[in-house]
A protein has these predicted regions:
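Extracytoplasmic ligand-binding site segments that recognize negatively charged/polar headgroups
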Residues: 1-117
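Ligand-binding "clamshell"
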Residues: 1-3, 18-22, 133-145
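A bilobed periplasmic-binding-protein/Venus flytrap-type ligand-binding module shared by bacterial periplasmic
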Residues: 35-40, 153-168, 184-187
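Periplasmic-binding protein-like
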Residues: 62-70, 94-99, 105-106, 137-161, 175-196
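A ligand-binding cleft/hinge motif common to bilobed small-molecule-binding domains
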Residues: 117, 122-140
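An extracytoplasmic/periplasmic, membrane-proximal ligand-sensing/linker region
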Residues: 88-90, 194-197
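Non-transmembrane alpha-helical segments in soluble domains
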Residues: 53-56, 83, 95, 113, ...
């Protein structure tokens, strides 16, 4: 069983991340996004894609990498996100078509964006936080969010019932939800978790 966390203000978080019973406090959203190397696309005289449908164009054949949805939770997030937006049948048909343009499928969610930085692909369906990390290190990348939204999975913090009044537990949780989470979110995660983020 989980304890109610009554010493952290849940109103600091955006509504869709709040737990109705305050037994869960959000930490972040691990999201995926379409990440491009604008310089590589420009070299090839290609526009930056503006939609998932754009990725099906012949001109992007062999320029796209994504995590394998059967091996990577990030790849599965992309599949599930489009299944939620369009319905399962349409999403599966889309990925069958997209397969013709895929250079390679990777086993992990950050590999496509790392390959984009290395110049191995121009378009990566990959982890947003890794792209932000690489941009912070100087990589020339653009992060795109299409109208269907970004695939994501939330992460959070809970306390096991019976431990919520222990001072070390309170201290750790209070510390985490001080400036630590604000610094973490502003440095690595553009997805909104907190109201004032």
């Amino acid at each position: 069983n989980l304890a109610v966390i009554d010493f952290i203000d849940p109103d600091q978080f955006v509504e869709d991340m709040r737990s109705p019973d305050n037994k869960y406090m959000p930490v972040d959203r691990y999201s995926g996004s379409v990440i491009v190397r604008p310089d590589l696309l420009e070299e090839k005289g290609l526009p930056i894609p503006q939609s998932y449908d754009d990725l099906l164009a012949d001109e992007y054949r062999g320029l796209i990498e994504m995590p394998d949805p059967t091996q990577s939770s990030t790849g599965y997030l992309f599949l599930k996100s489009l299944a939620n937006a369009w319905g399962e049948e349409e999403a599966l048909a889309y990925f069958d078509k997209l397969d013709e343009n895929i250079l390679q499928y990777t086993g992990g969610g950050s590999a496509p964006v790392k390959d984009a930085v290395a110049g191995e692909c121009a378009i990566a369906l990959s982890l947003t936080f890794k792209a932000v990390d690489l941009i912070n290190e100087g990589a020339d990348l653009d992060i795109l969010f299409f109208k269907e939204g970004a695939p994501y999975t939330p992460a959070g913090l809970s306390i096991i019932a019976g431990h919520e009044t222990r001072q070390p537990v309170i201290d750790v949780v209070t510390y985490f939800y001080s400036d630590v989470i604000d610094d973490y979110l502003s440095t690595y995660l553009p997805e909104k978790v907190k109201v004032d983020q």
